[in-house]
Amino acid sequence: MPERYNRVLLKLSGEVFGGGGIGVDADVVSAKAREIAEIANSGVQVAVVVGGGNFFRGAELQQHGMQRDRADYMGMLGTVMNCLALQDFCEKAGVDTRVQTAITMGQVAEPYIPRKAERHMEKGRVVIFGAGSGMPYFSTDTVAAQRALEIGADALLMGKQGVDGVYDSDPKTNPNAHKFDELTYDEFLSRDLKVADATAVAMARDNDLTMVFFNLEMPGNISRVINGEDIGTTVHR
């Protein structure tokens, strides 16, 4: 792992925004926004992809009989609500931000344009990506990998809720689960690990994008990962 990443894509799940519940937990989002602002103000270029699971999950709605593409679009709109919440708290913490969405909604966000996102980051702004890929059937993990590649990020930081890395089985149900400090992409995929979408990991492998899985709940962990501290699990070639 390098001493310090210069440009990162941070993936935040919707569960983080909800603090484990439905809607937005202002205290939790405010705390993460302060961390992100501190990192951006230190000179690291930061982009964020946010999920919408605290509002809607397309796959779960499908299980209840809803058409999958419509359910996914509902999930995408949920991510935009999270984007706006994070934007507000980041700006209160002292860093300029821009929200870009894959579904056009000019009153609240810019359209997603990779080159424009890069220019924003070069100027010290945090760029927050919402509305997934703008298309159904794509997970937020896959969108995060795609966005990281499009903006030339040094690494994709996968902030996790309730787990501090990648394990060989679910540590919540198996007290003997083994945590990996490092994995290759192929090891991750061959073990069929469920902590991230396989399509996202395959995309990272094919383009040599480092992924770091870490516990987002621990204060200061985002900065620790960016500065090269050995926490979480690094997935690379």
Curated annotation (Swiss-Prot):
UMP binds at residues 52, 72, 133-140. InterPro entries: AceGlu_kinase-like_sf, Asp/Glu/Uridylate_kinase, Uridylate_kinase, Uridylate_kinase_bac. Its EC number is 2.7.4.22. Allosterically activated by GTP. Inhibited by UTP. One of its GO terms (cellular component) is cytoplasm. Keywords: Allosteric enzyme, ATP-binding, Cytoplasm, Kinase, Nucleotide-binding, Pyrimidine biosynthesis, Transferase. Pathway: Pyrimidine metabolism; CTP biosynthesis via de novo pathway; UDP from UMP (UMPK route): step 1/1. Residues 18-23 are annotated as: Involved in allosteric activation by GTP. GO terms for molecular function: ATP binding; UMP kinase activity. GO terms for biological process: 'de novo' CTP biosynthetic process; UDP biosynthetic process. Gene3D superfamilies: Acetylglutamate kinase-like. CDD domains: AAK_UMPK-PyrH-Ec. It catalyses: UMP + ATP = UDP + ADP. It holds the Pfam family AA_kinase. ATP binds at residues 11-14, 53, 57, 161, 167, 170. It is found in: Cytoplasm. Homohexamer. Catalyzes the reversible phosphorylation of UMP to UDP. Belongs to the UMP kinase family. This is Uridylate kinase. It comes from Cutibacterium acnes (strain DSM 16379 / KPA171202) (Propionibacterium acnes). The lineage of its organism: Bacteria, Bacillati, Actinomycetota, Actinomycetes, Propionibacteriales. The gene is pyrH.
